[in-house]
Regions:
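Short, intrinsically disordered, charge-balanced linker/junction segments flanking boundaries
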Residues: 204-211
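Gly/Ser/Thr-rich active-site loops/lids in small-molecule metabolic enzymes
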Residues: 212-225
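Conserved alpha/beta cores of soluble small-molecule-handling proteins
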Residues: 1-195, 201-204, 222-297
Length: 297
């Protein structure tokens, strides 16, 4: 799950001395310039706004290092190629822009939203009218779920909104068009559940509200499972499989790794985060602190 439901700006110190630092307005990267957040604007004719025509990546950074940056950029470039979007920056320029955005905001731990829109065009749908894509980079802190939710687990509810099929929009593209996910989120809110469980047209579980692509956090969970000697099987699953599971967890860049303890009102396992989930979470947090692209070097 890559989509933050709640974003906060932390008043915790960004330096290592422990001294308090006042919360200050964000500095945003917009098309090669760093501007105060109140001046970070896009045109009303940008096709990212008009049609959701664009792509994005959500990227975490921990302890002064950007986590799996190269993998996120690989996915960004793949998404761009898939939708015939010519990125206006080189790989090295994009990397430096991400790092400098974090530096401008004096952060060591947080979340990056890297956005590329089709750019300014007219009110027509034709993307050839957009002469140059727009790049926006936001660095901030994030709290998708509370500490208590990570300790106690989430509740999920199956929603009526079906996940958009790959024949309509390939899930490998991390598109700006998230209305399908938003509608599922609304259903979860109305049901007073923490997350929505989405099904595909065959009735198999597709995802929750924020992830349906080659998940980078998901791949790390697979790596951890291999370390722990846990067999991974990738198969289609239904609600039945969730109901009878001993443990269940969700993964995503913003959410990281978090247990699920109840689905559609039915308790999963003991109703508490299980031992495998807890080991996964602990190891994931270790890995995020072990490496990454240095921000301040």
């Amino acid at each position: 799950m890559e989509e933050p439901r709640k974003t906060t700006r932390s008043a915790k110190p960004a330096n290592e001395s422990g001294s308090a630092k006042a919360v200050k307005p964000l500095t945003i990267f917009v098309d090669g310039e760093f501007v105060p957040e109140e001046d970070a604007k896009v045109s009303v004719f940008d096709h990212g706004l008009l049609y959701g025509d664009g792509i994005f990546e959500g990227i975490r950074f921990y302890n002064g290092r950007v986590f799996r940056l190269e993998e996120h950029l690989d996915r960004l470039w793949d998404s761009a190629r898939s939708i015939c979007l010519d990125l206006p920056m080189s790989r090295s320029e994009m990397t430096e822009a991400v790092l400098e955005t974090i530096r401008k905001n004096d952060l060591r731990d947080g979340y990056i939203r890297l956005i590329v829109t089709r750019g300014v065009g007219n009110l027509g749908l034709n993307p050839t009218q957009c002469k140059r894509p727009s790049v926006i980079i936001i660095a901030t802190t994030i709290a998708l779920y509370s500490k208590e939710m990570y300790q106690n687990g989430l509740t999920v509810v199956t929603v009526a909104t079906r996940r958009t099929g790959p024949g309509a929009l390939n899930p490998a593209v991390k598109s700006l068009n998230y209305l399908n996910n938003v509608m599922a989120r609304i259903e979860a809110n109305l049901a007073e559940a923490d997350e929505a469980l989405m099904l595909n047209d065959q009735g198999c579980i597709a995802e929750c509200t924020a992830e349906a692509l080659r998940g980078i956090t998901r791949s790390i969970v697979f790596e951890i499972a291999a370390e722990l000697g846990i067999k991974i099987s990738e198969v289609d699953i239904s609600r039945h499989d969730v109901f009878i599971a001993d443990e269940c967890l969700l993964s995503g860049t913003a959410a990281e790794v978090i247990p699920v303890v109840k689905a559609d009102g039915r308790v999963i396992g003991t109703g508490k985060p299980g031992p495998i989930s807890l080991r996964m979470i602990a190891r994931f947090r270790e890995i995020t602190r072990e490496g990454g692209t240095p921000i301040y070097s």
